[in-house]
A protein has these predicted regions:
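Short active-site neighborhood of thiol/selenol oxidoreductases, capturing the structured segment around
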Residues: 37-53
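Solvent-exposed loop/turn segments at secondary-structure junctions
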Residues: 49-53, 80-84, 108-111, 137
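Short, internal strand/loop/helix patches
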Residues: 93-126
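Loop/turn elements at helix/coil->beta-strand transitions in domains of secreted/extracellular proteins
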Residues: 38-43, 71-74, 99-101
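Thiol-/selenol-based redox modules, centered on thioredoxin-like
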Residues: 126-164
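N-terminal "domain-start" segment that seeds a small globular fold
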Residues: 15-36
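Sec-dependent N-terminal signal peptides
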Residues: 4-13
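Structural microenvironment flanking redox-active thiols in thiol-disulfide oxidoreductases
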Residues: 59-96, 111-114
């Protein structure tokens, strides 16, 4: 019995630790890293936090779409919480069923500077979702994004549509 309990605890700790390791520190310059890694490709950048009322709904919806449109849909999550919140963030995201989505968390004592680097007109309200086309022109939505909008954006930004 103790052996089984130990194995269960070890498995739980390992799963949580590996989830935590997949969350990157978002610092000055991180936005450019995210953009550079996706040069010429469309993607969705979602800013959220643990206290956000609408974020669970949006994140679950995006996760379902990610499963449906595996290759066409690239989603990056950035939490505006702090590094101290990483274990909670990993647990929360996992509870939404999210497994293979790139994740970041604000890692600055001055989050205002990070927000300014991302968007000079953003004051921290979440959810805030940026839809980048292949040329990295963006559409910004604040508040809950409807599934219909995301599906239309996907249709407009399929990799095949770049071949004209």
């Amino acid at each position: 019995m103790i052996k089984h309990l130990f194995l269960l605890l070890l498995l739980t700790f390992t799963t949580t630790a590996s989830s935590v390791e997949n969350i990157h520190s978002f610092t000055a310059g991180s936005m450019n890293k995210i953009l550079s890694a996706r040069e010429g490709r469309p993607f969705i950048l979602v800013f959220w936090n643990l206290d956000c009322q609408y974020c669970p709904t949006e994140l679950k919806m995006l996760n379902k779409l990610k499963q449906q449109y595996r290759k066409e849909l690239d989603v990056v999550l950035v939490s505006t919480d702090t590094l101290d919140d990483v274990p909670q963030l990993a647990s929360r995201v996992k509870s939404y069923g999210i497994r293979k989505i790139e994740q970041w968390v604000f890692a600055s004592s001055m989050p205002e500077q990070l927000r300014f680097e991302i968007d000079k007109r953003w004051y921290g309200e979440v959810p805030r979702t940026h839809f980048y086309n292949p040329a990295h022109e963006r559409i910004v939505k604040t508040g809950l994004v409807e599934k219909k909008f995301v599906e239309q954006w996907l249709a407009d930004n399929k990799p095949e549509s770049k071949l004209h």
